[in-house]
Amino acid sequence: EITVLGTVFKKKFLTDNNIKFNEEQKYYSDPEFWTKVLMNVKNYGCNKDSIYVKRYHNDKINLPSISQMEDDRKDAHFVQSFLDCMKLSESKNDIRNHFEKMACDYYVKVFSRKFHDNSADKESIDFALMSSMVKECGKKTISKYGFVEKKILKNATDYNMEKVKKWSNIRLIKRKLVMMF
């Protein structure tokens, strides 16, 4: 048996299905691993009496964890991981829909807020990359969002940065007004 990401797997299951981490992907390699597991697992069990011990370290200088590392290519790794998972989950709509929702949520809640912080050069590079991820999402997923969020996502699929900025600012103003009253 092998422990991966806090879960015990039979080694035979992982080797028979050729499930392993993508060594070339420094960040976000676990979603691809889990997608492969979900595509191949037939049944699973749970032992509620188990104890999981995790070592937590917070040394940003000598031994930083991956989440503490600063890297300009994290967005590129995120998009690549998303695209790999979408390819793997083509035959299972529930998994694919989950990834589409995660991508849209990330774009609306995290990425669209970056327009207030970054320089113009960085924005245009990240914008094309992140918008290509949203373009992979289905219209059914996008239709589940509110009016302003739909506008942000629709303009992202059209690669219209100015309109995404406009609607992101409207969303931000709307949220701030709600918090004030």
Feature locations, PLM:
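Conserved nucleotide-sugar donor-binding catalytic segment
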Residues: 1-70
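Gram-positive cell-envelope targeting signals
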Residues: 33, 41, 46-47, 61-69, ...
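Catalytic core of nucleotide-sugar-dependent glycosyltransferases
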Residues: 49-58, 64-94, 110, 117-141
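Structural motif
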Residues: 92-102
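Amphipathic alpha-helical repeat scaffolds of TPR domains
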Residues: 100-113
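Membrane-interface aromatic/basic loop that binds lipid-linked glycans or pyrophosphate carriers
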Residues: 116-181
